[in-house]
């Protein structure tokens, strides 16, 4: 009897517990409230925002490799820069290759050009030194200068050269003519018609222009000036540029 009562009593307790858990009031207590749900959502949003801010101020080191595409953007950029620099280097080398020969040719011309004729200036007063300018050109032991600003007669030209302890240029070789042609020197020269054909000295490149003249004209046209590779006879009273020569 006592056992049965005990069993019944335990059964009643279990039923009470089961009934209590199944009751609506108990289930409502077990469910999270709306306030708790909102706070949970807010915390999750706050964590997301904090994570974004952290990524902005503390970015992860770039690996430089896109796993999906298999392409390294940094490598591509450096390849483009390398190609551009290589192209520029090739262009510069090409330009330098074209410039060097021209510089050497200019240097050769400058080496044939003399500098100031200091020995000539030392022998004259200051006024005479005005004639000594960078127009003087050296060729071997000879210095030449063409005066283009003040045209003079043949006699005046010779006198002007003598004031500089020089004389009108005397051409006695083909090389000397080539030197004068190189620097485009035209003017009175110290050459007179003496019945000889001076062109034999220099071959067919140098020509003496002969014209039909009577005896009186020959006297008046006994002076010559150089124009290009041609000796031109003309009246000695004509005013032209002149070329002075100084020998050391």
Swiss-Prot record:
The keyword Glycoprotein appears for this protein: yes
SUPFAM superfamilies per the UniProt record, alphabetical: C-type lectin-like (SSF56436)
Classification via InterPro entries: C-type_lectin-like (IPR001304), C-type_lectin-like/link_sf (IPR016186), CTDL_fold (IPR016187), NKG2/CD94_NK_receptors (IPR050919), NKR-like_CTLD (IPR033992)
Side of membrane Extracellular, spans: 101-248
Record GO terms (molecular function): carbohydrate binding
Tissues expressed in: Expressed in natural killer (NK) cells.
Residue span of region Disordered: 19-44
GO CC aspect terms: plasma membrane
Entry keyword annotation includes Iron-sulfur: no
PROSITE patterns assigned to the protein according to its UniProt record, in alphabetical order: C_TYPE_LECTIN_2
Disulfide feature: 132-145, 161-244, 223-236
SMART domains in the cross-refs: CLECT
PANTHER family membership: C-TYPE LECTIN PROTEINS, KILLER CELL LECTIN-LIKE RECEPTOR SUBFAMILY I MEMBER 2
General function of this protein: Lectin-like receptor for natural killer (NK) cells. Heterodimer formation with KLRE1 mediates NK cell cytolytic activity.
Protein name according to UniProt: Killer cell lectin-like receptor subfamily I member 2
Highest classification ranks of the organism: Eukaryota, Metazoa, Chordata, Craniata, Vertebrata
